Amino acid sequence: MIWRLLAAFYPDRPPDEIQRKERCLKETEDMFAPVVTAMYIRDKGVEASEQIVQQVDMMVDIMKDAFKHNLPKLSWMSAFSLSAAQEKLEHMVDLIGYPKSVLNSTWLDTFFARAEIDATDYLSNVVTQRSFSRHKEILQFFETYNRGLWNDFAHMPDIAYVNAYYNQLSNIMVVPIGMLQPPLFWVKPKSLTFGAFGIVVAHEITHAFDDEGILYDQYGTFNPLYDNKTIDEFHLASNCVRNQYSDFEVLTGVRVDGNITLGENIADHGGLKIAEIAYHEWLKSNGRSDSQLPAVDFTHEQLFYLGYALPWCAVHSDNMMRTHIVKDEHAPDKFRVLGPLANSPRFSEAWNCPIGSVMNPESKCKIW
């Protein structure tokens, strides 16, 4: 019995002191996620954070509007499926930034009233954390569900992290406060922001309509969104993306799995297409006026694509890449840039890529 208790509540202890500190820090952040979020917001400035959230809220509306106006242009979508997709987009809830409750000290004290922490007893704290989390989960069964609030996400540790996500089961997109900073979100120029942050938002919107998203309706209920003909046409169009990524060689003899990464690749392609449309419309409505970066001679469109590529700059070891290919549903960073851009006529035009070149192939994949 004691062994079962230890196995359930006492994780493997890292032998290295630095690793132990990292684990303790991570578990503390997970336990006190609302507190960490509040600390992060106050460090950035509450007023400044609110202003950025307002700007992001407007940008999300621009992205959703671009997606909405692009839907009727999809040749593979029937009239019935078009109506269903528009309805799902209309019902999508956006949670931007952070829940205001985390800045209320009284609320925080009440929320953590049951959590008794002992600075000298790690095992006791692990048990407390598991018990506390389970208690909160049980309480949710007796609460009235409101899809428009942060209830399902406010206590998660990644609100202050750089990670937007879409929840299929509730049709909710979360854009946490941690994302609202460079190299994703820039005050100016807007080209960089639309290219980096705008594509992330559009990527998450597209998840509502990828190979998994089409299995759920506007309320997040397991109910196929499209009719059978549209689903067949969608999968036919998706085959091009599947084959494209399956040809990408990460290391000698090691290729991207076009099946495992399909959903994310579809979202990447859709995100780029929608962000391109949104920035083009924004430029047009602002008389093609946008800020420029000093000392570099790039057009607005070129900066847009540089903004897209910038967050994916990374160097990985061969061993990490082999692990990534097996365990991650995302393509490696490099191919999340090259794949979508090679299918973009606007990119080829902006950078004058010759027809038939690697970044401007004559045959391009087109889903969105």
Model feature map: region roles:
Residues 33, 37-368:
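Intrinsically disordered, low-complexity linker/terminal regions across diverse proteins
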